[in-house]
Amino acid sequence: MNTVEPIRDMDLIFDMMDFLKGQNVRDYVLFMFGIYTGLRISDILKLRVRDVKEKDAVYMREKKTGKEKRFAINDELKPVIVDFIRGRRDFEYLFKSPNFPNKPISRQQAYNILNVAARAVGIKDNIGTHTLRKTFGYHMHQQGVSLATLKEIFNHSSEAVTARYIGINQDIQDMSIKGLSYHKAGRGRK
């Protein structure tokens, strides 16, 4: 299995938003929900309208860990959710399948949605459902959130695991190698 990457470039994130919004509002909201909450796709897909309606946070038992978690709903995400669920019934899945009346879309459908959008906007990196979670973590870190806090949000065993997961280890390695200069060390010849 190939490792998937976060979407590091903000322009590409906005391109994904624009593309998905033009294709299908459900898919747009799925993308937004993922990059604004950092939830695993398995947890996003099991959400129902009642889980987010008039709420400031999502309370759930994580599918992978079995632990109870509370995830705040970001202020930029709230109006997107309000518009999306307007007129919908509380018991409906948030991201319901068009083929099955009372089922959510599958993980495979979510993967396909993200990959079609990524290719359409020119993203060359490996993209998958974990890309949403990794993008959330990467940009939270870029905006000053500590690895310690992200470790807790992601329920990781260490900050090193979190750094590797959100892709900042590779960024640091790349910057370090690009910054290497024997001339700047003062002893090299020009």
Predicted regions and their residues:
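Conserved catalytic core of the tyrosine transesterase superfamily
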Residues: 1-190
